[in-house]
From Swiss-Prot:
Binding site for Mg(2+): 178, 198
Organism: Thermotoga neapolitana (strain ATCC 49049 / DSM 4359 / NBRC 107923 / NS-E)
Entry EC number(s): 3.6.5.-
The protein's name: GTPase Obg
Domain (Obg) ranges: 6-164
Amino acid sequence: MNIKSAEFVDRVKIFVKAGDGGNGCVSFRREKYVPKGGPDGGDGGDGGFVFLRANPSLSTLIEFVNKRKFFAENGKHGMGKKMKGRNGRDLYIDVPVGTVVKDASTGQIIADLDEPGKVVCVARGGRGGRGNAHFSTPTRQAPLIAEKGEKGEARWLELELKILADVGLVGYPNVGKSSLIARISNARPKIANYPFTTLVPNLGVVKYGDFSFVVADIPGLIEGASEGVGLGNVFLRHVERCFVIVHMLDVSGFEREDPARDYFIIREEMKKYSPFLLEKPEIVVANKIDLLEREKLPQRIKEIESSIGKEVIPISAVTGEGVDLLLDRVASIVRKERIEREERKEKKDHPMEKPAPVWRKLPERFEVEVVKEEDGQWVVEGEGLRVWMERFDLNQRDARLLILQILEKNGLEEKLKEAGVKEGDVVRIGNFEFEYRE
């Protein structure tokens, strides 16, 4: 279950774009012996949605290094005979379990995909536009108007992988974390006597009787880690998911002279990164007791316990002494935390419902602006007007009439006069131009 450094990527940015809705159709029924067929333009199909899905077979975000942009399918346009266009296919993007999804522009967390199969919608498709069959009235029996489909949502996302491990091993480099994980699990990490031997989190599955749990060796913690010194700020996020923290100290005195000082430095770095980390259950272990004279061990452990105010379990990752006691303590905490997690999950667990497609309500009231451009042409603008123009095609006669009616209701005539528009001046609305007549 080791993660090779060449393949381990735990933070990326991706762009997602949902499909646009298909346009409604302008069509009229034309059949022999049906002289008054009437409008039969069908609706456009909805655009495809974009979902992220937690896949337990993935362990890294490496797939997103070379492919960062993802697009769902657009809805198909409506057709005659009131035939609705096909909806665009939804796009499912698989990510590792434990991926936190954030809006890249705001930093807001959208979802935490912390369970296999968990799904979140990150971009909604646009609703398909209505065909002209919807616009028939007693006074407009042959409507030359249909709606354009809504644009699908688009956004940049930040994906941040937080490893799902039950136990996090923390401590200064070379205190023996990799040696311990190699002894108690199936992991075979690289072990050497120099700082930052471990460059990525090592994961190991520990089988303890009929119980099993996952342990993660969190690399690179030194003073200043929370601010980017060493590798700690890169990997501290992986501690956040652990049920229990095993804080390892070097008690031999050969490399680390003051284990108590080391303990407080690491705890301070964890606090700076997230005070929440200090609330997690913690087991403190003193490693490398095989390198210490036996008669000095009890006094050494007592001094450390007195300094940090916590019980310390003496172990040797090399010989295995004390490891069974450590595993018994760890397994007890993990069992308890898993039960509590399942109880919390049952209370809030509910299936995800697919949200409605994007469909903006057309504003009835809005501000109208008349602006004179450098070429002397007058342009009608307004946020509400923009929504109407995005919904309808001004090349369609009835669409132009409808928008002009809405503009009249919102004071277009008065705005034109206030701006100084004179008879014969050219006024533009979108891509449509007309001469002003009083």
